[in-house]
Amino acid sequence: MNLITTIITITITLSAVLATISFWLPQISPDAEKLSPYECGFDPLGSARLPFSLRFFLIAILFLLFDLEIALLLPLPWGDQLSTPTLTLIWSTAVLALLTLGLIYEWTQGGLEWAE
């Protein structure tokens, strides 16, 4: 048997065993918490029209922006390999300065205050 067939067989077998165990284990000692679906901390059986915290939304957007910043700056060390590393440094500094100015503006406007 060649290597790819062996790996595929092991993968399918392991997946089937783990899926069977995951369906079998909660039924050994059923509990209301085990049988209920989990949706990000929200009650799935409650009203869908509950108010959503705008502060939480703004903090989540800020997190996404700075997460994107990290993703944009990760290839920066490879930018030194280019023919013009100075241009790479200028652009990365501009991105960092723009995001820092945005963070300072958000901070001064009180957008990062969780409770007033």
Swiss-Prot record:
Core subunit of the mitochondrial membrane respiratory chain NADH dehydrogenase (Complex I) that is believed to belong to the minimal assembly required for catalysis. Complex I functions in the transfer of electrons from NADH to the respiratory chain. The immediate electron acceptor for the enzyme is believed to be ubiquinone. The keyword Transport applies. It holds the Pfam family Oxidored_q4. Coiled coil: none annotated. It is a multi-pass membrane protein. It is found in: Mitochondrion membrane. Its EC number is 7.1.1.2. One of its GO terms (cellular component) is NADH dehydrogenase complex. This is NADH-ubiquinone oxidoreductase chain 3. Its main location: mitochondrion. It is an enzyme of class 7 (translocase). Belongs to the complex I subunit 3 family. It catalyses: a ubiquinone + NADH + 5 H(+)(in) = a ubiquinol + NAD(+) + 4 H(+)(out). GO terms for molecular function: NADH dehydrogenase (ubiquinone) activity. Keywords: Electron transport, Membrane, Mitochondrion, NAD, Respiratory chain, Translocase, Transmembrane, Transmembrane helix, Transport, Ubiquinone. The chain crosses the membrane at residues 3-23, 56-76, 87-107.
